[in-house]
Amino acid sequence: MESYSDLPQLPILASPRQAYAERLLHPVEEAMSTTVAEMLVETLHTIGVRQIFGVVGDALNPFTEAVRKDKRIEWIGVRHEEGAALAAAGQAKLTGKLAVCCGTTGPGANHLVAGLYEARKDHAPVLAISGGVPASRRGIDYLQENNPDLLFRDVAAYTQTIIDPAQAVQVVHQAIAQAYHQRGVAHLSIPADVIGAKLSGPAAVASLNTLRPQPEVTPPESEIAHAAQLINAAKSVAIFVGNGARSSINDIAVLAEKLQAPVLHTFRAKDMLPYDHPHWIGGVGLIGGAPGMDAMRDAELLLMLGTDYPYSEFLPTRTQTIQIDERGFVLGRRMPVDLGITGSVGPAVTQLLQQVQGKTDTAFLRKVGEHRKQWNATLDKHAVMPADPDKGPIKPQYLARRLSDRAAEDAVFVVDTGVVTLWCGNWIRQSGRQRLLASFNNAAVGTSLGQGNGIQALDRNRQVIVAAGDGGFTMLLGEFMTAVEHKLPVKVVVFNNREWGLVHLEMEEAGLPAFEGAEFPNLDFALFAGACGAQGFTAKTPAQLEEVLGPFLAAPGPAILNVFIKPSELPIMPHIKLDQIWHFGMAKIKEAMISMGGAG
């Protein structure tokens, strides 16, 4: 199986494969015996697609047959179309390249939609292909008929039904172009009697060299000069980075050193620098820490690079702020900014490095760095081996830290949504080569395994660790069979607390006792793994965790580690308010009264 480096790249991505570029620039027009399905497969392969995720169905038969005959694209059949969409979203989020998923007519397409929101909300290029009822039967409430354009209108940046083979080549080109340039979902509905039909014109999509990620946008020189003036005048500067700064992080580190500035990050940007980098202070908000929050508040100037951080309640309102983003519409929409610059982070930072003056006063950086040491020490205290390692359940902080300690240097962590996000976001420490993905902006429970399968399919030799709560894992439990069937060696760690943990915390924060629906019984996840033909492990105490963690991570195929964690453990808040303490206390009193049969 090809590794990441083996996949053909577009010239814009600095590929050495000039032969590949030549193929893009000079497509071959084949005989008119080519079908719409065959043209689509050829196009996808030419632009670098190597897997397609989906569930087979009769409306897709001509397409899946074209994939089978072509043999260059791997079909990965999933157990639920949402899993296909999540797998494609995971690939696209990790690589920035187009990924593809499929579902058949009606319900198959419906099931894709929930997973496609993962790509929409995290701005990842995904092409979704759905079958459709025969064009001649549309409009008469035919079996499984729906309105695909209406169904996909919100989730997709582009959605189109191909009703005539003559339009197929141009529409396919447009769909891929829109997925890249809108950084989101493009959807094609192709009726059963169209996808297998012969093309009446050119059999290849022209101008494939235009189908690539958006080029960088150079910001206006005058605005960068203004930003440099503000930075030079500020006594202290903090830099806040998001995923839009990923490709420029090395230059940002140089800028931070020149300005004696701490660098803060969003959750999605957590993996951009090693956790122990001297300027890497930490995150903000609940999946962050007090040092980052305080640095952002106390700096005389905040420089925001490539971030549209959505939680405005954690952002300062009185700090002088410069925001740089190539999406001009996000400037100033979360907080007031003094200077908003439309442009890509890379060229902006390059220009700033040439124009800003180096700062020699290290007092602010040293103060923030000392705060980081204290905060990390607090986190460490919650992640040590307990005095009695044979006593369970296991603290989730300890589990997350041990995963961090034992993971491969280039491991990919895929974290589900819920309280598991807090444990992994705060206690996993990444080396710089490791990656961490989650449902960053969709915040959907049950998305981690599907995304993990997609990422693992890119490179079956790279370690992929899925961290999920028991509730989230059971939502798409069948996707573990996808991993087994297609030999995707994902390692699934189940944070088993027998409840919807984050919902429980939110109830208590509001002063409410836990609702009975917040708790549930579980199956034996280790036995389930064995029933699927994989390996399963269980840990109920820290000692057992130490015993099984090595064999679990070394398992040659997919595996599940079922870890019984302490359900009552509370996350560490950056700043706790008195009313939160009061509400938690009242909730615990109410829960105790209910358990004793008293009034709620």
What are these regions (language model features)?
Residues V28-M32, A166, P202, Q229, ...:
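Phosphate/pyrophosphate-binding active-site segments
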